[in-house]
Curated annotation (Swiss-Prot):
Task of the protein: This enzyme scavenges exogenous and endogenous cytidine and 2'-deoxycytidine for UMP synthesis.
Cofactor: Zn(2+)
Record organism: Vibrio parahaemolyticus serotype O3:K6 (strain RIMD 2210633)
Domain CMP/dCMP-type deaminase residues, every copy: 48-168, 187-295
Cofactor note: Binds 1 zinc ion.
Identification of the protein by name: Cytidine deaminase
Keyword check for Transcription: no
One of the record's GO cellular component terms: cytosol
Length: 295
């Protein structure tokens, strides 16, 4: 991944590469840019807001994990705080294609897990597929969301998805990323399970009530969480494992370093992620233990 970032730097305009290199090559770079850093880059490069976001896409695509398609897609969302979050597509050998994560989903869930309660705009390499348009329509900010493509004028999400079907059609008022804090607790004192409960309390599952969260522990002790992101159209829903795996990659870590996983689900939910979680992790590494709790 670092080599891909270095390649992106080599291909970027000199003024951008010079200013960006110390940021993206730093050991603590977390695939985000603060509003202040973005403003500094605008000033140093004389690029417009749109031009700079498009120029940053190769750096987001550097995080892509696409062993099947070898098609590397990047996306960048701007949270309500003004911070920019990178995302990239993610695929898995030996697992059915429904487990794939698109770049738009990656960037959005990245922002969500880092505390954003909505996104203002999204910048992507290629026109969003129907799956992602539907996924974005679940967002708390869907009505205001702007979509930017290279060499295109900015458009609203609903210009890409007219006459959209969404949460309101099913009587749901709260969207994905809306500020929420469920009150689930678990008697099991295992630290990884407690981290999964924290993720569960962020989750969005108004259609099945399968509020759920997952935590992954790496060999170096780092822990990454994923909350379930359900969708009114069902199929574009993003499972908690995928949300957590996205955080692993965007932190510059690898799947090889996953040491353990914990999944916590609402006992009153109408579905379960357990079987798919186990099968996907087994494809990555059959030795990863999975703890599971219903609360």
């Amino acid at each position: 991944m670092k080599s891909r970032i270095e390649q992106a730097l080599a291909s970027a305009p000199e003024a951008l590469s010079k200013q960006l290199a110390p940021i993206v090559l730093a050991d603590d770079f977390d695939a985000t840019l603060s509003a202040q850093q973005f403003e500094q880059l605008l000033s140093a490069t004389s690029l417009s807001d749109k031009e700079l976001r498009v120029a940053l896409l190769p750096f987001a695509a550097a995080y892509s994990y696409a062993p099947i398609s070898e098609f590397y897609v990047g996306a960048i969302v701007r949270g309500l705080s003004g911070r920019l979050y990178f995302g990239a597509n993610m695929e898995f050998f030996g697992v059915q294609l429904g487990q794939t994560v698109h770049a738009e989903q990656s960037a959005i869930s990245h922002a969500w897990m880092k505390g954003e309660h909505g996104v203002k705009d999204i910048t992507i390499n290629f026109s969003p597929c129907g799956h992602c348009r539907q996924f974005m329509n679940e967002l708390s900010t869907a009505k205001e969301l702007k979509v930017q493509l290279p060499e295109r004028d900015e458009k609203s999400l609903h210009e890409y998805l007219p006459e959209a079907f969404g949460p309101a059609d099913l009587g749901i008022e709260s969207g994905l990323m809306a500020e929420v804090k469920h009150q689930f607790v678990c008697d099991d004192k295992d630290a990884l399970i407690q981290q999964a409960v924290e993720a569960m309390n962020m989750s969005h599952a108004p259609y099945t009530n399968n509020l759920s969260g997952l935590a992954l522990e790496l060999a170096n002790g780092r822990v990454f969480k994923g909350a379930y992101a359900e969708n009114a159209a069902f199929n574009p829903s993003l499972p908690p494992l995928q949300v957590a795996l996205i955080q692993v990659l965007l932190a510059g870590e690898t799947f090889d370093s996953i040491k353990a996983a914990a999944l916590v689900e609402n006992s009153e939910g109408k579905i379960s992620h357990l079987a798919d979680t186990q099968s996907t992790l087994e494809a990555l590494n059959p030795d990863i233990p999975v703890s599971f709790v219903n609360v």
